[in-house]
Amino acid sequence: MKILFLDQSGKPGGAELCLIDIAKPYRDRALVGLFTDGSFKNLLQQNNIPVEVLANKTIQVRKESSLAQGLKSLGQLAPLITKVVKTASEYDLIYANTQKALVVGALASLFSRRPLVYHLHDILSKEHFSQTNLRIAINLANRFASLVIANSQASKTAFVQAGGNPNIIKVVYNGFEPKIYQTSKSDIKQLKQNLGLERQFVVGHFSRLAPWKGQHILIAALAECPPQVTALFVGDALFGEQDYVQQLHQQIAEMGLENRVKFLGFRSDIPQLMAACELVAHTSTSPEPFGRVIVEAMLCGRPVVAAKAGGAIELVEHRINGFLVTPGKPQELAQVITTCLQEIETTATIAHNAQAIASQRFDVTTINQQIAQLLSKYGSDKPTG
């Protein structure tokens, strides 16, 4: 089966990392069409996945865009849609991996008469999307998609509650390669030395710096933890979110935590950095559709504490394979951090359980088999290694 994958992003986020794993088995007869140039294209090329930037300029539509802004963007979309329709005629299936890709993919599906699959990586709610964009996404999916793949039960539930057709949606979790998350003790020791964290109890936070990701929650919790607890933030702010970064530094200064917080910015050595942490914290204040960071921490053999909402509830069972806390409650988070610091053996057992469960439940080979089975209706060919 020949698949045309579509994605709007030039930068690799969770949806894009997921797409790499899905596209790999089909790479000898697939193309990933991007709407923006950037580092994601380089990452696809490193994985030997054919890629082409299809748009000449960035499409200016945000999740919270109004109807007028959305209609204005249609003029920008016309050349892109024309190109995608022409390209799609050479493929058996259009696979839209993001919401803007759904808009383009739906129209391309109509004109090229190719089936459309939409991979839903978002919780479609008014909390994250304008009413206009919500309506567009649901109507296009209902009208044009043969299949919607949701990355969690939480994403599926929100889709159906927003008016999505429950008969076309299936849940498939993200897949991971467990071996990527294995780091030697000597490498961990060296990394902690390089970071100046040898004697610290390190709580890692891995995500872009944004208010809803809740870095400020961890900083507030840190103030209530023993002095050997240090927070390590890995990730950058996107354009327009620099004010939040300034707020974080102001919060740190006001609480006198300058010597207990490190910002590393964007890093590519995530598994190694996670392995160098004693605990990984997920502190999103809004429901997370899936939570790749949670699974990655588990695969690294590190205990994880997650905000009890959205997809995280499907990944973490409290005190079985991790810890759950109420979103936006620093006091609860501080209690869990202190517990992990004091109850070392119990915490190690929980982390070991999590690693064993995650290695089986989210193995990329198993997940890709689930995807292939769903896509098999659109062609008799199976993916090659």
Tell where the protein language model's regions lie, with residue ranges.
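A short, well-ordered alpha-helix in the C-terminal region of glycosyltransferases
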Residues: 332, 339, 346-360, 367-373
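Conserved acidic donor-binding segment of nucleotide-sugar-dependent glycosyltransferases
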Residues: 317-319, 323-330, 339-345
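A conserved mid-protein helix/loop that constitutes part of the nucleotide-sugar donor-binding site
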Residues: 13-21, 201, 208-224, 243, ...
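Active-site donor-binding acidic/aromatic loop of nucleotide-activated sugar
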Residues: 240-245, 258-267, 273, 323-324
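Short hydrophobic beta-strand element within catalytic cores of glycosyltransferases
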Residues: 303-306, 316
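N-terminal strand-loop element at the rim of the active site
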Residues: 5-13, 21-74, 155-158, 170-171, ...
